[in-house]
Amino acid sequence: MSTLKADTIQSTSGGAATLTKQVAAKTWSNTNAAGTTINGSFNVSTLTDTGTGIQTIAYTSAMANAIYSATISMASDAANHEWLDSQATTGIAAKHYTGSAYADVATMWQIIGDLA
């Protein structure tokens, strides 16, 4: 058995290695729904607060089509409902409902699919 140890992996031209023939998150983000704060992200250009409990992220690099896997996790402590809405090649929206009203909560996003 061989062991590969490396600090940097580059393409043959010396640039960054591209993710091909792999299933890896093409977008991830940790956002604060009470405003437009992005705590950390990859391939996210903006966060739009479109209303209480509703937020939309825009991708820096578009997806190849609107058929991709999107998951969210929202910070809440009750029997709440979260769902994704308006899935497009350029971004996606998430909504959070407490059972009686929409509420702003921190949201963690992960998008898997092909980039354009």
Residue ranges and their predicted role:
Residues 25-116:
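Extracellular attachment/recognition segments
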